[in-house]
Amino acid sequence: VARANSANEQIVRSTMRVMIDELSVGKESPAGRWMGVNGLFDGQPADSVAFLTLGQFRGAESAKESELVRIVYTREGDLLLRFVRKNLYGLTDESIERVELARKVKGFNVRYYDGKTNLWLDEWNGAVRGVPKAMLLELMLQQENEELQTIRQWVTVGAP
């Protein structure tokens, strides 16, 4: 059981690293603002965050608006999901890719650091606030017959 839990934790940590990589190069654009929604499901955090980032992690210098993708991370039931819209101007669901990032999720909490007010916030409106300076992601998982496990990751957004 310990080996399986260790393997699960490694998978979750690598998933969180991908999320951190995408969030760290997040962009602000009229094509899509940062948006963070504070949610609950079964009394536990079920937040959602939507943002623009560079497709395939291209260098910031070469990024054109057409290379940006819209990403949404959200908890639905016991799943952590990632939605990607590669065509920002596409109107059909065909331009949306859905990926299951984690199972047995009991909570997904996102906090946003506003560098202008020096406050941590539970929700984010990019139309008013722009891009958050930093974020805290908390993913709570419950494996079979195990205690609730919380994995936390900090990320600086828009870092050079």
Regions found by a protein language model. Name each.
Residues 49-50, 99, 135:
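A broad, low-specificity signal marking well-ordered, structured residues that form hydrophobic/aromatic
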Residues 106-160:
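Short linear sequence signals and composition-biased patches located at protein termini or domain-edge surfaces
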Residues 67, 93-95, 149:
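Residues that act as N-cap/strand-start positions at coil-to-secondary-structure junctions
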Residues 80, 97-106:
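Local beta-strand/beta-hairpin segments that build beta-sheet-rich folds
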Residues 61-62, 90-99, 121:
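A short, polar/proline- and glycine-enriched secondary-structure boundary/capping micro-motif
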Residues 59, 77, 102, 122-125:
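Periplasmic/extracellular, small/polar-rich flexible segments of pilin-like filament-forming proteins
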